[in-house]
Amino acid sequence: MSTALPLCSILILAGGRGQRMGGRDKGLVSWHGEPLVAHVQHVVREFSDDVVISCNRNQERYALYADQLVSDAEVDFPGPLAGVITGLKVARHEWVVMLACDAPLIDQALIEGLLRLAVEHDSAAMVRQGGYWQPMFSVLPRRVLPMLEHAWAAGERSLQKALLGAVPVQALECAENDQRLSNFNSPELLL
């Protein structure tokens, strides 16, 4: 018998500079007639009444897909760890599903798998694809916030290092060629 999934917040990270997209805001780049962030939001919406998008520009456009918007406290696109810290501060639920805005092929089974793994072990859960951690596909308990803030204050800027150093992390193993984990972070990948 499977247990019910807990209420969770969804944190979609869309605050990057978009360098590999020629400076374009990746989450708003169109794919199959909709912005990439819309594809992610459609998949996750049924899991939560609290979709938070971390974005540092184009807030009015992102507002269409979020219940809350946050921006990094630091200027000049400091990286995903800054967005995670800011997002965890406003998340309304104890569990937070964290995803990249440029991963439109995710599905509900992936989200459910991460959530179940995190809840069963009462710890963070992260995709490990072909032996490599993928921090942009994670579930975090909000209680990791002080540990991530401490890592940031100590100079850590790597999301993966901060997460793996802060708390036990359960691995959701995925195949190296799992298309659900594709990041569309360059124009060529959108074709």
From Swiss-Prot:
Its main location: cytoplasm. It is found in: Cytoplasm. One of its GO terms (cellular component) is cytoplasm. Keywords: Cytoplasm, GTP-binding, Magnesium, Metal-binding, Molybdenum cofactor biosynthesis, Nucleotide-binding, Transferase. GTP binds at residues 13-15, 26, 72, 102. The N-terminal domain determines nucleotide recognition and specific binding, while the C-terminal domain determines the specific binding to the target protein. This is Molybdenum cofactor guanylyltransferase. It comes from Pseudomonas entomophila (strain L48). The gene is mobA.
